[in-house]
Amino acid sequence: MAKITKVSPLAPAAFPTLPVIDGVRLASIAAGVRYQGRTDVMLAVLDPGTSVAGVFTRSATRSAPVLDCQAKIGGASDGPAAILVNSGNSNAFTGHYGQTSVAEVTQAVADVTGVPVGRVFTSSTGVIGEPMKHERIVAKLGDLNAALSPDALEDAARAIMTTDTFAKGASRTVGIDGKMVKIAGIAKGSGMIAPDMATMLVYIFTDARVEQGALQAMLSAMTDKTFNCITVDSDTSTSDTLLLCATGASGVDAEGNAEFAAALEAVMLDLAQQVVRDGEGATKFVEIRVTGAANDVDAKVHGLAIANSPLVKTAIAGEDPNWGRVVMAIGKSGAAADRDLLSISFGDILVAEKGWVSPNYREEDAAAYMKGQDLVIGVDLGLGAGKSTVWTCDLTHGYIEINADYRS
C-alpha cells in the first residue's frame, strides 16, 4: 500500500483537544492486518443504554461489515454496545468468507467485552477483494479490552487511517437546561470520496440522551448537508460508515433541541471538510456555492457536477481561472440552466454574467486569486431560490502517484 510520508498542506496545525465523552471507552493496537509498525485496530465500548444510529454507503457492492451493521442498526438499546474498526483491509468483495469473518470477529468481541453480539458493530477500510486475516484481530481483543480508556480518541483516529496524512477529530459543547453536553467525533478519509458517503469512516459520540429513532432521523438529515456534500474523486466506496452514539451519561435529554442539533451538524461539517482537506494529493480546498437554481436539488446537482469535473479540478491545480470549464460542468449536469442568465465568480471576482465574460473581468486578478489555498467558486443560475454548497479539492499528480501505488 502506498506509503504516505508528507502531510497535506491543507491539514490543521494539530489534532484538536477532544473532550472525554462519559460512557465511552476506547483502545487501539497494532494487529498487523496489513501495516507494520503502526496501530490498525480500534475498539470502542459504550455503556448500557447507548443509542446508536448509522448511515452507510449506497454502493451495490457493500462490504460484509456494512451489511452486518445495517442489519443491526435500530435494534434494542438497553445493553452495552461496541465498535471495532480495522484499517488495511476492507473485507469487501470477499464472498462468504467475508461474512464468516465478520461473524467470528463480532462473536469474539462479544465474548471478550460482554457486549451482546447484536450490539457489536464493525467497520473495515483498506484494500478490496483480499481475504481478511481476522484471526490477527481476534488475537488482540484481550489486550484491547484491557487497555480501554475514556481519553483515547486521538489514538483511535490514528488507528483507522489508510492513505490519510493526518488524523481527524472535532468537537463541540452546548448548554442545555443549565448543563453542558459534549459531542466529539473522529473520521478517516482521503480518497474514494464522493457523495453517498465516501471511503470514509466516521464515529461521533455524545453524552446527551436521545432515543434511537430520533437520533437516526437527525443523523440522516444532517448527512445530506455535510458528508453527502463533499467529493474528492467522485468514487463511492464499498465501506462508508458513519455511526452516531448517544450514551445519555449527562442525563440531559437533547431530543428536539435546536442548539444540540446545530452543534452536532457543526461537528459533522468540520469532519467532512477535514476529509476534503486530506484529499489524496490535494493542494487546494474548494467551496462551490450555487444559488439561483430552480430548487435545492438542482443546485446540489450543479455543485457536484463542477466539483467532480476532472477538467475543473485540474485547472484549479494549475491555478488557471478557466471559467469555461465551470460553464461546461453546469451544462452537462442535467439540471435546469439558462446560459444567458448564468453568473460565475471566483471569490469576489465576477468572471462571467448574462452568457458572456463580465465586462470588468481582469484575468490577472483571477489568476492571482487562484494561487490561494482556500478558494470559493460562486455560481448564480438566475432561475429561482434553490441553493447548495459543496466542497472539493484540486486534482494533482499526487493523486495519481498515491493510487498507482496503492496495493504495493
UniProtKB/Swiss-Prot annotation:
Pathway: Amino-acid biosynthesis; L-arginine biosynthesis; L-ornithine and N-acetyl-L-glutamate from L-glutamate and N(2)-acetyl-L-ornithine (cyclic): step 1/1; Amino-acid biosynthesis; L-arginine biosynthesis; N(2)-acetyl-L-ornithine from L-glutamate: step 1/4. SUPFAM superfamilies: DmpA/ArgJ-like. One of its GO terms (molecular function) is L-glutamate N-acetyltransferase activity. It is an enzyme of class 2 (transferase). Substrate binds at T162, K188, T199, E280, N403, S408. GO terms for cellular component: cytoplasm. Its main location: cytoplasm. One of its GO terms (biological process) is L-arginine biosynthetic process. Its EC number is 2.3.1.35, 2.3.1.1. Keywords: Acyltransferase, Amino-acid biosynthesis, Arginine biosynthesis, Autocatalytic cleavage, Cytoplasm, Multifunctional enzyme, Transferase. The record marks T125, G126 as: Involved in the stabilization of negative charge on the oxyanion by the formation of the oxyanion hole. It catalyses: N(2)-acetyl-L-ornithine + L-glutamate = N-acetyl-L-glutamate + L-ornithine; L-glutamate + acetyl-CoA = N-acetyl-L-glutamate + CoA + H(+). It is found in: Cytoplasm. The record marks A198, T199 as: Cleavage. Belongs to the ArgJ family. Catalyzes two activities which are involved in the cyclic version of arginine biosynthesis: the synthesis of N-acetylglutamate from glutamate and acetyl-CoA as the acetyl donor, and of ornithine by transacetylation between N(2)-acetylornithine and glutamate. HAMAP family: ArgJ. Heterotetramer of two alpha and two beta chains. This is Arginine biosynthesis bifunctional protein ArgJ. It comes from Ruegeria pomeroyi (strain ATCC 700808 / DSM 15171 / DSS-3) (Silicibacter pomeroyi).
